[in-house]
Amino acid sequence: MIKLVLLRHGESQWNLENRFTGWHDIDLTDNGRIEASNAGRAIKEAGLTFDIAYTSVLKRAIRTLWNALDVLDLMWIPVVKSWRLNERHYGALQGLNKSETSRKYGEEQVLVWRRSYDTPPPVLDKDDERYPGTDRRYAELGEAEIPLSECLKDTVERFLPIWRDTIEPEIRKGRKVLIVAHGNSLRALVKYLDNISEEDIVGLNIPTGIPLVYELDDDLKPLKSYYLGDQEAIKQAVQAVAGQAKA
């Protein structure tokens, strides 16, 4: 049986402040670092190990991976960083407080922007200081690849190439894979793996710092999936994510 482990980064400073983060490169809080280390312990207690890891080019995910691998004594394994695993780009919402945005635009509209499949938030202007096209880490991307805003559909479309061309072949070789990424890039992968409908994906929330294990068959089709840790605490963490945009 194949086991794939997914992990959303630990709590970031903007998670704590309940702000739309997107591609902004904010770091973990002290609690987020603890979450990352605890994730490593949960993985270790489950008897899981890895041959290779994948993460984004954003420090909250990279540092989460470092902390987890440190606990696992696996800091030596290859790590592939890719912009394709970045959080979805929240466009002009990036940096705004979610509750304040809900009070301004209404909870229903903000839920559509946060969780719908094909409705992106308002776009950034290219002269906005938040535009990622001036960031060195994206220097090799074509202008069309640099988002001004993204819906989940856009995130799926940029994530799947690295899954199909890079990660999936490694799994088929028998390598044990860990993916540390973000709420929406992981939602994109979960939607693909579980074949979740565009309507049902609205209700999927992934908490910070809790390992999600997928057991896959030889065709990489899910047999089952489950979070590692105290199930009641995990349920509360999922509910907390769902309630972030309440006015």
Swiss-Prot record:
GO biological process, one term: glycolytic process
PROSITE patterns from the UniProt entry: PG_MUTASE
Gene3D superfamilies: Phosphoglycerate mutase-like (3.40.50.1240)
Record-annotated site: Transition state stabilizer: 182
Catalyzed reactions: (2R)-2-phosphoglycerate = (2R)-3-phosphoglycerate
Active site: 9, 87
Alphabetical list of InterPro entries matching this protein: His_Pase_superF_clade-1 (IPR013078), His_PPase_superfam (IPR029033), PG/BPGM_mutase_AS (IPR001345), Phosphogly_mut1 (IPR005952)
Residues bound to substrate: 8-15, 21-22, 60, 87-90, 98, 114-115, 183-184
GO terms assigned for molecular function: phosphoglycerate mutase activity
Domain of life: Bacteria
Stored SUPFAM superfamilies: Phosphoglycerate mutase-like
Enzyme class: isomerase
Pathway, per record: Carbohydrate degradation; glycolysis; pyruvate from D-glyceraldehyde 3-phosphate: step 3/5
Keywords, alphabetical: Gluconeogenesis, Glycolysis, Isomerase
EC assignment: 5.4.2.11
Annotated function: Catalyzes the interconversion of 2-phosphoglycerate and 3-phosphoglycerate.
UniProt family annotation: Belongs to the phosphoglycerate mutase family. BPG-dependent PGAM subfamily.
Xref: PANTHER family: PHOSPHOGLYCERATE MUTASE
Protein name: 2,3-bisphosphoglycerate-dependent phosphoglycerate mutase
Name of the gene: gpmA
